[in-house]
UniProtKB/Swiss-Prot annotation:
Membrane topology: Single-pass type I membrane protein
Pfam families: Ig_3, V-set
Ig-like V-type domain boundaries: 22-141, 146-257
Residues in compartment: Cytoplasmic: 285-414
Protein name (Swiss-Prot/TrEMBL): V-set and immunoglobulin domain-containing protein 8
Alphabetically ordered keywords of this record: Disulfide bond, Immunoglobulin domain, Membrane, Repeat, Signal, Transmembrane, Transmembrane helix
One MF annotation (Gene Ontology) recorded for this entry: RNA binding
PANTHER family xref list: V-SET AND IMMUNOGLOBULIN DOMAIN-CONTAINING PROTEIN 8
InterPro entries, per database record: Ig-like_dom, Ig-like_dom_sf, Ig-like_fold, Ig_sub, Ig_sub2, Ig_V-set, V-set/Ig_domain
One cellular component (GO) term of this entry: membrane
S-S bridge residues: 44-126, 167-239
Localization terms from the record: Membrane
Length: 414
């Protein structure tokens, strides 16, 4: 009993000394993820017990602790001693760090760190010394925000095809997470659930696969594959690239064209063009057939031996190519009595007379019997229709030979 009572008395006597200490308010360790270029306040508020007020001075130190155990060292970059503020041995921090309070001895040893750089990533420790010492650590991780990503699509946006939505950020501290969201257009339960998932990209992928197989991850983290697309997939899709300190977005549009409808339209157009082509060919064939018969006859008539009414044929047809004895005269459709021999025979008068002169020139004097040219008038020939025309050659008398060439009348020998 005496031993226990003595030990209890000792604890009572020593308790004021054990309780008198510097205490820093807040958690013992804090972890911060900060963006490059930001400003941050590293807190270190402290309190002193009444027993701590004494002749001993107050010392405050801020140091950067290397987390690598092999190179563990402490670099004091800011301190307060003997009521003076001192900058330490880190030049890259001297212009960017200061105490938050003008007088750190007033129970606040917090500091402001400005324009953070990725190289500022480290563990920062605050130490407050009086009769005793208290410490507090803050782990600072400085990262670059994701760069503005690029969004684009690969694949033909036609009904039933597969389309890949691509998203890529060229800058930003790793790890980067990619998420897609449909921000306009048709929304369906399985689409909305997968797009609005708050999980990271990889866990979101398994969440999608459990609902619908048409959404898959591509070869890269920022790829989203839409399989067997339809008009229900039309809309704007937003890609969000994020890390611990920020995010950036880009938007791409999906507009599916119905290839079946396009095929029907193309078929209708081609069918219409084919029908018009066939109609044009048919009309051209009919025109050629009609013009071919009349043209051939006209061509023959132009030379005086066709059945049609050619230029040279006039109203007469089926004229022989040359005049023979006992040849049948062609039919004549002369309109009046004034028709000339050209309309009877189908030849111009001068040509007939020249032909008769050459072919039926009078025989030499004293030749065979006399031949007379049978008279024929245009009116008689036209009224009677085709009739034989006989050409008789009359032998010239000796007196005629003496007188000269036989006289002609109206292009015929008389």
């Amino acid at each position: 009993m005496r031993v226990g009572g003595a030990f209890h008395l000792l604890l009572v006597c020593l308790s004021p000394a054990l309780l008198s200490a510097v205490r820093i308010n807040g958690d013992g360790q804090e972890v911060l993820y900060l963006a490059e270029g930001d400003n941050v306040r590293l807190g270190c508020p402290y309190v002193l017990d009444p027993e701590d007020y004494g002749p001993n001075g107050l010392d405050i130190e801020w140091m950067q602790v290397n987390s690598d155990p092999a190179h563990h060292r402490e670099n004091v970059f800011l301190s307060y001693q003997d009521k003076r503020i001192n900058h330490g041995s880190l030049p890259h921090l001297q212009q960017r760090v200061r105490f938050a309070a003008s007088d750190p001895s007033q129970y606040d040893a917090s500091i402001n760190l400005m324009n953070l750089q990725v190289s500022d990533t480290a563990t920062y420790e605050c130490r407050v010394k009086k009769t005793t010492m208290a410490t507090r650590k803050v782990i600072v991780t400085v990262q670059a925000r994701p760069a503005v990503p690029m969004c684009w699509t690969e694949g033909h946006m036609t009904y039933g095809n597969d389309v890949v939505l691509k998203c890529y950020a060229s800058g930003g501290s790793q790890p980067l997470s990619y998420k897609w969201a449909k921000i306009s257009g048709h929304h369906y339960p399985y689409r909305a659930g997968s797009y609005t998932s708050q999980h990271s990209y990889h866990s979101e992928l398994s969440y999608q696969e459990s609902f619908h197989s048409s959404i898959n991850q591509g070869l890269n983290n920022g790829d989203l594959v839409l399989k067997d697309i339809s008009r229900a997939d039309d809309g704007l899709y937003q890609c969000t690239v994020a890390n611990n300190v920020g995010y950036s977005v880009c938007v791409v549009e999906v507009k599916v064209s119905d290839s079946r409808r396009i095929g029907v339209i193309i078929g209708i157009v081609l069918g219409s063009l084919l029908a018009l082509g066939c109609l044009a060919v048919g009309i051209w064939g009919l025109v050629c057939c009609c013009c071919g018969g009349s043209g051939a006859g006209g061509a023959r008539g132009a030379f005086g031996y066709g059945n049609g009414g050619g230029v040279g044929g006039g109203a007469c047809g089926d004229l022989a190519s040359e005049i023979r004895e006992d040849a049948v005269a062609p039919g004549c459709k002369a309109s009046g009595r004034g028709s000339r021999v050209t309309h009877l025979l189908g030849y111009p008068t001068q040509n007939v007379s020249r032909s008769l002169r050459r072919k039926y020139a009078p025989p030499p004097c004293g030749g065979p019997e006399d031949v007379a040219l049978a008279p024929c008038t245009a009116a008689a020939a036209c009224e009677a229709g085709p009739s034989p025309v006989y050409v008789k050659v009359k032998s010239a008398e000796p007196a005629d030979c003496a007188e000269g060439p036989v006289q002609c009348k109206n292009g015929l020998l008389v």
